[in-house]
Amino acid sequence: MAFEPAQHSFITLEGVDGAGKSTQARLLARALELAGYQVVSLREPGGTAISEKIRALLLDPANTAMGDTCELLLYEAARAQLVHEVIAPALAAGKVVLCDRFYDSTTCYQAFADGLDRQMVRDANNLAVAGTHPALTLVYHITPEQAALRMAARGAADRMEAKGMAFQERVYQGFCAIAAEEPNRVKLIDATATIEEVFAKTVEQVRAYGLDIPQEAVAAALAQEAE
């Protein structure tokens, strides 16, 4: 299946905290740019002035009183603004959009982990994206225990990361469930290997979906990362 301009150039990268998806998003953006694509790289929550302010509220460790429904609606507000201001216009202009987290994270964190009604979360996601859905989602597959070992070196955790191992286990199970439910869109990638090996699998999936990334661009992206 090949990408169609303005419709299928939206790729999201997902996984538990510490899975390495942000590194892979950065590498993929570089490789695509070197291959000649116009790329818009984003993260959630964030990506616009309004969305970044909401991000600060969501991740502030001091906001321990935040209720689950409040949290859900803040994520959706940040997402709605990002889609309206950046994602939809970029896709309409024929650009490739890469987003580090999107609505699958909301499903896993707020429905599977926090226990909010999944249909309510699905409806909220659909309201926020207004028909703008990712064509390909790469889930970086690593257990919460393995991810925790990586994150130990990162220092202080944000409010979401500090919710504990049982919470992260439910998030992990959520991503596994989504991958099983939507195998055409959602692809699991073993994130326990080296950065280079994981990136090779990432590129393999993106190529299979229709974006041409020459091996020279892959090598150059990895070389830049190592500098």
Regions found by a protein language model. Name each.
Residues 18:
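Walker A (P-loop) phosphate-binding loop of P-loop NTPases
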Residues 13:
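Hydrophobic anchor at the beta1->P-loop junction of P-loop NTPases
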Residues 24:
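Hydrophobic positions on the alpha1 helix immediately C-terminal to the Walker A/P-loop
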Residues 35-129:
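ATP-dependent small-molecule kinase phosphotransfer cores
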Residues 2-4, 27-29, 145-227:
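NTP-dependent small-molecule kinase module
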Residues 101, 105-173, 177:
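A glycine- and Lys/Arg-enriched "phosphate-lid" helix/loop adjacent to the NTP-binding pocket
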Residues 21:
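Conserved lysine of the Walker
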Residues 10:
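Walker A (P-loop) ATP-phosphate-binding motif of ABC ATPase nucleotide-binding domains
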